[in-house]
């Protein structure tokens, strides 16, 4: 016998409505998304698996799989970050010439203690263990199983085979209870796909120097002699003193001897006024790295002995579980040797080391560098197409960290990528336009100095001759980041660099330096890798060179300059070209969609550092 819910009664409109409500309630309590109305969205979307090449679905991730998650918290007063930076640059303002301590940042910008505790309690109640909050109160870490993660964040986790490796990722967005809406902005660690890659190019010397002495190799926007100047000699590989000479940090006669008297003592505390030139002796710098750096530290010592450089004190800080991975040794060798090399000396070098190259793990290393507040600059020679960190939520959290760095007077540097104006999802290959137009992150963050690449030509004694834009130099217009106030025409102070049709989007890069060539060496770095000499290049070279250049300038000003972004754009002349006579303006070459032009462009930014000139004219943001 079949029964009807309404068998004994006549079906009236009132009963029909009651039945409909009943079925909806029944469905609500029996559906997998029964509590959908109680969840709030975060910035973490479903992983864009369609962009993974050679990806094959395996099935649901085993519920017992151990996972480590990073929960990003919404900072307070987010709309006051740039106004505060502007106040720090404004004479007469009470904040003029200052920077925040970590404690001051937490008070004004960090999530509140009540919010942090609410997130920690939720995670603990959900079954997570080892729940800890970062000192700057921007994130909370926790360990849990896949089952706990899926339940706590109303998401699904799947396994995929990608190029023979098994990875997991979230196939649904991450959500949190509505009670945490506006508190949690992102949930990281829901995938272990290593999206970030280094921007390093290995190079070889040409058959003879005369092969390059006849002018540069053809570029996207080619020029050939007599249109292009011809250097007096072709210098294919560079040591630290060579870069110092080329970028006007030292004279050919004594590349490392030009040091102010105050900087030769045992203390850097005797600063009283800007010096005309110095080494980076009084400035601590950092490098965001990954894996086991045992050999990297040894290689730095070998490099210092090879080039008669002062030995730099080194500290390795793990931002997670120590990893035995050594696949990135050449990258971290390049970063450490060229940055301290062009600086000639720094007071201390810190490696902030991630467990892996995933967004979540590298984010922890970045946060360690920022919240430790030990350095005045740090380098990131890696990146990825910015739509990945936008979709997984790491962009919004990392931008909070970079904003904190700027407020604390720290300048992050990042490679603009090695794929010209495009960005292929599988990583850089040095081929412009191979992929859709996009910029690389973290370079596109407004609180990071994005560094593009050039081909540098010097005279026989390594003095500067000219530069041409490297055809693989990353650059363009961000799809997701807005232009900060300093990346604007200084004439009016309101019109952004990018055209109004781009709605004030962030332009990349900010500056550029030698990237070394694509296949044949043009200005490649001669470094030590695993105890032996090797030639390398890419924007992985130009970024640490820029950080080392900034270290010299900071030391010359007693580490009182603060975040570099607003300062370097103040050197520009204003609309319409934003030309800066204090940088080496690069006006030849291109990167695919964009061409190097007089003034600012989306290939080389403002140009390359003339260290001596910039050091002399950079706006002093501290009381005299």
Regions found by a protein language model. Give the residues of each.
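N-terminal secretory signal peptides that target proteins for export/translocation
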Residues: 1-15
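Bacterial N-terminal signal peptides
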Residues: 18-30
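Sec/Tat signal peptide C-region and signal peptidase I cleavage site
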Residues: 30-36
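Substrate-binding/charge-relay-adjacent region of secreted/lumenal peptidase catalytic domains
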Residues: 37-136, 141, 146-451, 478-538, ...
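Active-site-proximal C-terminal subdomain of hydrolase catalytic domains
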Residues: 447, 452-467, 471-483, 546
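Predominantly extracellular beta-rich ligand-binding scaffolds that present long acidic/polar faces
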Residues: 448, 458-465, 546-554, 564, ...
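Aromatic sugar-binding interfaces of carbohydrate-active proteins
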Residues: 557-596
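Long, intrinsically disordered, low-complexity Ser/Thr/Pro-rich regulatory/activation regions
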Residues: 594-600, 606
